[in-house]
A protein has these predicted regions:
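Eukaryotic intrinsically disordered, low-complexity regulatory linkers and tails enriched in Ser/Thr/Pro
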Residues: 1-87, 92-95
């Protein structure tokens, strides 16, 4: 997955729909939370570590933003465990 170009992705149970900035769509057979876990580990922390850090820094425990790397900060639109959750890349939406 190209994290720097990822605009958003949607959890679809055991698959993930990924939308890139150039409007390309890709379907991955890997669940969204597993993709996030692998990306977080690649950039130095676990997914749970990123969630714990967000909660510690903000005092919030709901809809934790997931910092993957400087180009990818994902904001879930609802509970991360919900089957149809969208994860929006703050940096791509901002631009």
């Amino acid at each position: 997955m190209e994290w720097a170009d990822c605009l958003a992705f949607q959890n679809k149970g055991h698959t993930t729909i990924i939308i890139y900035e150039d409007n390309r769509m890709q379907e991955s057979q890997v669940p969204a939370l597993k993709l996030l876990q692998e990306a977080c580990l690649r950039f130095g922390s676990s997914l749970q570590g990123r969630i714990d850090s967000f909660c510690h820094l903000t005092g919030s425990r709901q809809k934790a933003c997931i910092y993957v790397n400087p180009a990818a900060l994902f904001i879930p639109n609802q509970s991360m465990k919900a089957e149809d959750t969208w994860f929006l890349n703050y940096h791509r939406i901002l631009n």
